Design a protein with these regions (language model features):
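Short alpha-helical functional segments enriched in proximate histidine and acidic residues
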Residues: 47, 88, 144
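Amphipathic alpha-helical packing segments from all-alpha helical-bundle domains
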Residues: 13-23, 68-94, 104-108, 116
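Hydrophobic/aromatic-rich alpha-helical bundle segments in the mid-to-C-terminal region
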Residues: 55-60, 71, 93-140, 148-152
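Short helix-capping/turn signature of helix-turn-helix
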Residues: 60-66
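An amphipathic alpha-helix adjacent to DNA-recognition modules
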Residues: 1-23, 38, 42, 82
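Short, structured helix-loop boundary elements
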Residues: 4, 8, 12, 34-38, ...
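Hydrophobic alpha-helical connector segments
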Residues: 24-53, 106-110, 150
Length: 152
């Protein structure tokens, strides 16, 4: 049985892994925001599917970890990650590839549908492999990003 501190360490490590992989996608597709959005959706689904136990651990314990002794470590990691994401949005907007959109809105339309379908899969409510939803959700996420209003 894992202790609370071991669980917290595992959650922080898992989230930092997801963030690291996200930043790699931003860097690998620097001039192609459509590829970034679609690949981020795929990443989330594949990350969930590749280690179901880790995904469940994060889903069940994330808020508790954020409020506990490792909360500041997680918050610092999140600040750095969100800063990188915001810088990417700004660079894409400055290059005319996307509108200068709100980070919160972009994050919601890209990740929320992938997170929701992942929850259904983790609960055993979907029969198909989670990765099979990547293409339609990626297309929907990109269409949603294109429909977002410029922040003002």
């Amino acid at each position: 049985m894992s202790t609370d501190s071991e669980i917290a360490e595992q959650v922080v490590s898992a989230l930092e892994d997801h963030q690291r992989r996200t930043v790699e996608i931003l860097e690998e597709n620097e001039s192609d925001p459509e590829a970034v959005v679609k690949t981020l959706v795929r990443l989330h689904l594949e990350w969930t599917e590749e280690d179901r136990d880790r995904a469940i651990l994060v889903s069940r314990n994330r808020n508790e970890v954020a409020a506990g002794p490792l909360g500041e470590k997680l918050a610092a990691s999140n600040r750095e990650f969100f800063s990188r994401m915001k810088a990417w949005i700004d660079s894409q907007a400055e290059a005319g590839r996307i509108e200068p959109v709100s980070f919160n809105l972009l994050h919601a339309v890209v990740f929320a549908p992938a997170q929701e379908i992942s929850k259904l899969w983790l609960a055993g409510r979907l029969k198909r492999p989670l990765g099979s939803y990547a293409d339609p959700l990626g297309e929907a996420a990109w269409a949603s990003v294109c429909a977002l209003p410029a922040r003002g």
